[in-house]
Amino acid sequence: MILPIIEFCISNLASGSQKAMEILEKDPNLDIIEYSCLSYCTRCADTLFALVNGEFVSGETPEQLVENIYRHLEENPMF
């Protein structure tokens, strides 16, 4: 089974998305990956974000980011 891939930038984790990643890591149906940089530097400086199956998803708070990630997955099923 192919799992959705959620990618985080280490710089953004330090800016606050760490909590979102920790919440998402508890979900066995997601593949969570950390990278040193995802090349979204301008947006990374402005908001919490993750790439969800390669698409940019953001949130004002870690909780909102988690909510937006799950919403994105519901609206964009892999199959």
Swiss-Prot record:
Q: At the top level of its lineage, which domain of life is listed?
A: Bacteria
- Per its UniProt record, what HAMAP family does this chain match? UPF0349
Family from the record: Belongs to the UPF0349 family.
Report what the protein is called: UPF0349 protein GTNG_2908
